[in-house]
């Protein structure tokens, strides 16, 4: 971590501007107090892995699936500096031995913690299933049960593993998702700060 913070102009590859991966990259660089970090957006999935392997970028904020798929832990080809629990409190036992600090440990103020909570919330939800207001409860319950059954179906689990190179599915079930949505900050100050990280302007001062 000390070497990372001492370096200037670290190139961080990320998804396109506005994507949750792009926002995570900018928020991480901000909270870790990196010196003049260069966020390089525009990469899609495997393209970023290739750029990282070629040395076109110095760092990336990667999902646990990406790390496991490329066996980066056992090969010891990269350094890990921090983790982002998504949602908060959900830990991956495969990385426990690394003893990584959570990114929230670097948040200094309530404002920064709210920013992080908003980022986590949007990242946790992914693609949401929405129903219009006043939808009868019995219909809501039917959809919830359908989601639960889908994600616990052995056929779904096997297909997921096949598509992700053996990664385990960790779905956010309906009631958990509702809790995450409810806890996303809605105050104007946090929203405006979040917009600055979602855009392509310079990172704000701390």
Q: Each predicted region: which residue ranges?
A:
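Hinge/capping helix and adjacent helix->loop/strand transition within the periplasmic-binding protein
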Residues: 1-54, 103, 107-114, 122-159
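Alpha-to-beta junction loops
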Residues: 8-11, 53-62, 75-79, 147, ...
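Short helices/loops that flank or line small-molecule/ion binding pockets
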Residues: 26-31, 46-60, 65, 69-76, ...
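Glycine-rich beta-alpha junction loops
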Residues: 41-45, 63-67, 84-90
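C-terminal lobe and pocket-closing loops
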Residues: 70-151, 189-192, 200-206
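Mature extracytoplasmic/periplasmic domains
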Residues: 85-91, 103, 148, 152, ...
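Extracellular/periplasmic bilobal clamshell ligand-binding domains
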Residues: 154, 172-206
